[in-house]
Amino acid sequence: MVVVSVPAEVTVILLDIEGTTTPIAFVKDVLFPYIKENVKEYLQTHWEEEECQQDVSLLRKQAEEDAHLDGAVPIPVASGSDLQQMIQAVVDNVYWQMSHDRKTTALKQLQGHMWKAAFTAGRMKAEFFADVVPAVRRWREAGMKVYIYSSGSVEAQKLLFGHSTEGDILELIDGHFDTKIGHKVDSESYRKIADSIGCSTNNILFLTDVTVEASAAEEADVHVAVVVRPGNAGLTDDEKTYYNLITSFSELYLPST
């Protein structure tokens, strides 16, 4: 087993989700298809609710910002618009954003609310790699703080950890960050996270499967290890040489233990 030693100054472990704690297949084959298959029904069922209207309003604002993009789908204002046409416009906008792998806050918020309904109804449970929960327990026993940083909304993150095949494991996580604090490819985001936690950036070890994110974190003086999991994107030879690579959280060695 390859062992990566965690620097002594590290007191916080920051985790990505997709491809790091959770198989990409679960996200791509379960979570996202659920949105596409159910968004129209969800909107029709919840349209009059305040939460749903807030989601639609945020999507409309995003659509206005996206108006200059090729193929962007507008969402008309409610007045004078046929309800089914309105709903279809929102559905089409969601499809368009997802087809372009957009990670807008507006899209993530609606997805989070849809997943909440599905998870709380027991229609799905989140999957984690087998090494994740035992490792997080060990880290916490060693005095580490554990945080999540994902492009998925904080609400969606809490759903995953609260409704998993391992049960409710939210108690193992000290806090959550999403794109509201900044994008994961922007080094400033990691400085903001450190400020929010109340530590220095070099007190953080970030685990991610995406080297562009790892590079951004390093620019902020955050320690990184790149996680290699089944189904993840391949790495270049240079990336394999440059980064500390792990295939399991059990390969991290804490000097304090």
Swiss-Prot record:
Catalysed reaction equations from the record: 5-methylsulfanyl-2,3-dioxopentyl phosphate + H2O = 1,2-dihydroxy-5-(methylsulfanyl)pent-1-en-3-one + phosphate
Cofactor(s) needed by this chain: Mg(2+)
Keywords: Amino-acid biosynthesis, Cytoplasm, Hydrolase, Magnesium, Metal-binding, Methionine biosynthesis, Nucleus
Record EC number: 3.1.3.77
SUPFAM superfamilies in UniProt: HAD-like
Biological processes, Gene Ontology terms: L-methionine salvage from methylthioadenosine
Compartment(s) of residence: Cytoplasm; Nucleus
Sites where the protein binds Mg(2+): D16, E18, D209
Xref: CDD domains: HAD_EP
Cross-referenced Pfam families: Hydrolase
Molecular function terms, GO-annotated: acireductone synthase activity; magnesium ion binding
Main location: cytoplasm
Cofactor note: Binds 1 Mg(2+) ion per subunit.
Pathway: Amino-acid biosynthesis; L-methionine biosynthesis via salvage pathway; L-methionine from S-methyl-5-thio-alpha-D-ribose 1-phosphate: step 3/6; Amino-acid biosynthesis; L-methionine biosynthesis via salvage pathway; L-methionine from S-methyl-5-thio-alpha-D-ribose 1-phosphate: step 4/6
InterPro entries: Enolase-ppase_E1, ENOPH1_eukaryotes, HAD-like_sf, HAD-SF_hydro_IA, HAD_sf
UniProt binding sites for substrate: S150, S151, K184
GO CC term (a single one): cytoplasm
Principal EC category: hydrolase
UniProt subunit comment: Monomer.
Similarity remark: Belongs to the HAD-like hydrolase superfamily. MasA/MtnC family.
Function: Bifunctional enzyme that catalyzes the enolization of 2,3-diketo-5-methylthiopentyl-1-phosphate (DK-MTP-1-P) into the intermediate 2-hydroxy-3-keto-5-methylthiopentenyl-1-phosphate (HK-MTPenyl-1-P), which is then dephosphorylated to form the acireductone 1,2-dihydroxy-3-keto-5-methylthiopentene (DHK-MTPene).
Name of the protein in its database record: Enolase-phosphatase E1
Species whose genome carries this gene: Mus musculus
Gene name of the record: Enoph1
